[in-house]
Amino acid sequence: MVGWGVLILLMVLWLPRQAYAMHIMEGYLPLGWCLFWAALCLPALILGTRSLQKQVGDNLRMKLVLALSAAFAFVLSALKLPSVTGSSSHPTGVGLGAVLFGPMAMSVVGCIILLFQALLLAHGGITTLGANTFSMAVVGPTVSYVVFRIFQKSGFGRGVAVFLAAALGDLSTYLTTSLQLALAFPAPIGGVASSFWKFASIFAVTQVPLAVSEGLLTVIMVNWVMKYSPEVLSRAMNLPEEGHHEA
């Protein structure tokens, strides 16, 4: 685990200090919308806190896997790639935690990640924390969890279910962000729908391949956790320790 910590620290130090990626930056949304999205996040954060206490408790191995999931999401969501018109896109990394601990637990982890990124990396913002939390830490993990359960129960291998969960969770985050921006800034002609299409197309060029890449990375991480501590993965995913699906 020490090696992973050193790697993550080096990646964080390498990250650019000015980021205007898929996180909505400070001061960009009107105050009313900031309060609206923050209010929508509160139920998920309350339920998520209870979920984490119930799942993790004093179990050291569960704490390590939770920390790994948080570090994975922090590093991936802090990376940025140039998109069209001067914007940028990035992975979210929340699929791993959503699969292992559920969407409500990941809402708390994601909110903390976004807060640290806003304070340390100028990535996102404090006033827009609610909006960014709703898209990346509420909607994204929820979609990832639902997709994973559907494909898992449909008899697909663990690898396929995890890949689709992470990739579609990533895409749902960027679609939610596009909707948030469209609602706040409707186009003079075409209104919210036209504005949504504009914002979504800005992200789509880079976000689709990023979602595929994130899906593959998440599968690798799940397989690594399975080798490191299969009982933790089985418990987190509510699977029996024997007879689980293989990738």
Swiss-Prot record:
Pathway(s) of this molecule: Cofactor biosynthesis; adenosylcobalamin biosynthesis
Cleaved signal peptide residues: 1-21
Keywords (A to Z) from UniProt: Cell membrane, Cobalamin biosynthesis, Cobalt, Cobalt transport, Ion transport, Membrane, Signal, Transmembrane, Transmembrane helix, Transport
Membrane topology (UniProt): Multi-pass membrane protein
Cellular localization per UniProt: Cell membrane
GO biological process, one term: cobalamin biosynthetic process
Segments crossing the lipid bilayer: 27-47, 64-84, 96-116, 119-139, 159-179, 181-201, 202-222
Pfam families tied to this protein: CbiM
GO annotation, cellular component aspect: ATP-binding cassette (ABC) transporter complex
Xref: InterPro entries: CbiM, CbiM/NikMN
Gene3D superfamilies reported for this sequence: 1.10.1760.20
Molecular function GO terms recorded: cobalt ion transmembrane transporter activity
Similarity comment: Belongs to the CbiM family.
Record text on subunit structure and interactions: Forms an energy-coupling factor (ECF) transporter complex composed of an ATP-binding protein (A component, CbiO), a transmembrane protein (T component, CbiQ) and 2 possible substrate-capture proteins (S components, CbiM and CbiN) of unknown stoichimetry.
NCBIfam families according to UniProt: cbiM, PRK08319.1
PANTHER family linked: COBALT TRANSPORT PROTEIN CBIM, PTHR43627
General function of this protein: Part of the energy-coupling factor (ECF) transporter complex CbiMNOQ involved in cobalt import.
Name of the molecule in the record: Cobalt transport protein CbiM
Organism: Kyrpidia tusciae (strain DSM 2912 / NBRC 15312 / T2) (Bacillus tusciae)
Annotated gene: cbiM
